[in-house]
Amino acid sequence: MRRALALALLALLSGACSNEQQIPDETNAPAQRVVTFAPHLAEIVFAVGAGESLVGVSAWSDFPEAVRDLPLVGDAFTVDQEQLSLLQPDLVLVWQSGMPAHTVDELRARGFRVESVRTRSLGDIVAAMRRIGTLTGHNELAETAAGEFSQVLDTLRERHREAAPIDVFFQISSRPLYTVNREHFISEIIAICGGRNIFDDLEGFAPTVDIEAVLDRDPDVMLAGANVGDDAFMEWARWPDLAANRYNNKFLLPDETIGRPSPRLALAAQSVCFALEAARSNMRDAS
């Protein structure tokens, strides 16, 4: 299960490109039968008040609880054509950074209305909430949800505006060693909390790095999502002079929400800020 979640997260971070063109809905009628091909899209559908219109979801969709009982239509890379035909959706939401373009084209060729949703940045997530609200006829609820999400982030940003800068390494996976660049929503969250992503200058949404590069940049803090596992930082113990080791600043975030570009990232951002506050405290105590 943990390995599957890690693979799904890496797919999200890899930025596989799919076509953003949509088949127009000439009636402009709100969608009544929606399927989603990524767990975070199902979350957004519920967040904007359109949960009752959701009739099918992708593998690993587990939040909110209600999605666990819905039929599975595949994942970002495969489509259960038979199940999709049975469900007859009037809106198919796909993940722009995950589903391959040829799969999107095949869905459109079969006559399905497909909306390709971009969720690479925090701003993208807000836009996705509003767009899905419009498509499902829940504009007002979507605007409220988007506003609440933005307000949490704005509050955290203001709270940490004067915080002492702190160098952060975010570890997506251990083998291979993946991290995030400046364009990634995780890097945005680190910045909101007053941190500096040590690999913000790299190309690629989720670049691979080697151990030597991490040691050379000597982060004050190491963060990882729960999907990496309890042993996420075990290998780093070999270098006691690493700043994150000297300050005891290695934090495994409490759940997997940091890897999902959904409204629950507001909660994940609070966890990141809490970790960086604890890290600063550890550094003060050590000085």
Regions found by a protein language model. Name each.
Residues 2-7:
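Sec-dependent signal peptide recognition
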Residues 58, 183-206, 226, 251-252:
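His/Asp/Glu-enriched short active-site or ligand-binding loop at hydrolase and phosphoryl-transfer sites
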